[in-house]
Amino acid sequence: MNAQFAMRTSQCIIMNYKLTIILLSLLLTSCGEYVRLQKSTDPEEKFQAGKNYFQEKKYTKSVTMFEEIVPYYRGTPQAEEVLYLLAESYMGQKDYYSASEYYQAYLRNFPRGTYAQEARYQVAYCYYLDSPDARLDQEATYDAINALSEFISVYPESNKVSECRKMLFEMEDKLAYKELLNSKLYCNLGLYGGNNYKACVTTAENALRDYPETKYRDDLVFIILKAKSKEASLSVAEKMKERYSEVIDEYYRYANAFPDGKHIKEANRILREAKNIVK
């Protein structure tokens, strides 16, 4: 029994060893072929290799092949495909910045090319994917909004329009949320270094104007009410009633728009406080 077990174990070890040798040989052959292609001076061979690597989803290698032959094929019938596949390879690598740059290069060179519609969509999608957290700089978000709007305008019948609209609303909501965060910050700063309550109100009002369909409308309208209430509570005596009257007006703006809003209890408390001052 022990002898049979030992024999089987030995056979497994030998099989694993052979398999390892085969895999290493294949890997070395593959690496050797890639190195050879890098050194090749034949652009057609590199073009075909790049397409093969792209089909195999070996995007790092396809990027290398295509980048090396872009200058050679410039002005030729193959230039369009080379440039587009290079952009697609960067997309496969999830290098959205580089991908967007090459998609745009494609559009500049081939505005009516075979892949023009897809390239324009991919530019917008790259910006969308590169859009950061709302707390960070939103340049990519603005770029995404512009590119998505442009795609919808240029290709209104495209089956991607619905998807683009969803991404567009998402990007606008992100900007609205950033303005909500800024409004909250101003409200919390209060009178530190100046009247930040006014800055809070202005920021929130601008967000409501710029993004009227945002899902943060409830929060934005409420932060205006809250800021005006806090400002009124810190007012000098001769201005207090006037400012609390504005608070009451602001309450009805909120309550009429959001009778079951998530801030309605706090809004009702603010109303009671305001009425006690104004009466």
Region annotations inferred by a language model:
Residues M1-Q4, R8-C31:
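Sec-dependent bacterial lipoprotein signal peptides
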Residues L27, C31-K279:
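Acidic, polar-rich low-complexity tracts and alpha-helical solenoid repeat scaffolds
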